[in-house]
Regions:
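A glycine-rich beta-strand to alpha-helix segment
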Residues: 85, 113-114
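Positively charged N-terminal leader segments that act as targeting/secretion signals
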Residues: 299-316, 322
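N-terminal glycine-rich anion-binding loop in soluble enzyme alpha/beta folds
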Residues: 3-62, 66
Length: 323
């Protein structure tokens, strides 16, 4: 690879996958109320447990200076850069990366492309993974950019939060809305729009209806024949995926990579979340020669039996109005 792909830990790919794909990753810190970074020392499960005990966590944003320092490292080596960022509709990291790109290009004769994923969580992870895999398998700089254009446009997300107390405790919904929603078992179905912003798409009562609604929404928005994998996601309760996997199988999907939500999203919405990411169209044939390893070093799951490690992260719910 004559260029470097840079992303950040909000894509939530596990360390083994990152190492295999030779991706450069910015670390987003997850700090407790005392400012201590716990993302290195605690597993997702341990952080979920702390949250249920009443602890709160915050996440950081990658600064202009951090991007500049990282870019300079590769610029000094003469290495071209493709930098993927969390959606500009959710975070200021894209703007910070663009400012750093401008300064680097004034000093060094290298190519720097900043790609706004317009995605969050598993969608961002999916984009990062396929781009890294293509580069690992010999795709050129321009071919990876071409693939990224497709992935950014076709990546879709559907998810729900089934306990709003964490959104309330984080100041993102009112006490009244959280109480009413939990008492009446009302679940918000959330998606990410074309500008990379999270929005309330539907409201349903109960998990069973949420599974059905997610499938209906997916059916409306995809022309995929099911040959590309779907990425179901969960946090603290893996059992929530059983009905989701079954409904996907009933629709002809048989390739799944079940993913654990990372701690960064949990800092904003809590551990009570599930959903999926998918492509609205099949991956074009011209890219598939670079994606023959699909799910590098990981298993394709036909049944919900074993689950790959974390791949999914960061939904910034600031200013999100659920109702």
């Amino acid at each position: 690879m004559t260029f470097k792909i840079i992303s950040d830990s909000s894509c939530d790919l596990d360390k083994k996958t990152l190492d295999n794909l030779d991706l450069e990753i910015f670390k987003i810190n997850c700090v407790d109320e005392e400012g201590q970074d716990l993302s290195e020392d605690m597993s997702n499960k341990e952080i979920y447990k702390k949250m249920r005990e009443g602890f709160f966590f915050k996440t950081s944003q990658i600064t202009f200076y951090e991007y500049l320092k990282k870019f300079e490292k590769f610029a000094e080596e003469g290495t071209d850069i493709i930098c993927l960022t969390l959606s500009s509709g959710l975070s200021g990291t894209y703007q910070n990366a663009c400012m750093a790109k401008k300064e680097i290009e004034e000093k060094y004769d290298i190519r720097v492309e900043i790609v706004d994923s317009l995605a969050a969580s598993v969608g961002f992870g999916q984009i990062t993974y396929f781009a890294g895999l293509a580069a690992k398998n010999g795709a050129t700089y321009d071919e990876v950019l071409d693939l990224l254009k497709f992935l950014v446009e076709k990546t879709k997300h559907i998810f729900t939060v089934y306990d709003l107390k964490y959104l309330y405790e984080g100041g993102r919904v009112s006490r009244t809305k959280a109480k009413i929603s939990n008492v009446l078992n009302i679940l918000p179905i959330l998606e990410v729009d074309e500008e990379g912003r999270i929005y309330l798409s539907e409201i349903v009562r109960g998990k069973n209806k949420s599974y059905k609604k997610m499938m209906e929404m997916m059916d409306e928005k995809t022309s995929s024949d099911g040959s590309d994998r779907v990425f179901p996601v969960y946090a603290d309760d893996i059992k929530v995926l059983d009905p989701l996997i079954k409904k996907l199988e009933d629709r002809g999907y048989d390739k799944f990579l079940s993913l654990e939500v990372g701690h960064t999203i949990a800092a904003h919405v809590g551990p009570d979340i599930f959903g999926l990411a998918y492509l609205s169209e099949n991956i074009p044939e011209k890219f598939k020669k670079y994606l023959d390893w699909l799910i590098l070093k990981l298993k394709i799951h036909k049944k919900l039996g074993s689950h790959a490690t974390s791949f999914f992260n960061v939904l910034n719910f600031y200013n999100l109005m659920l109702f």
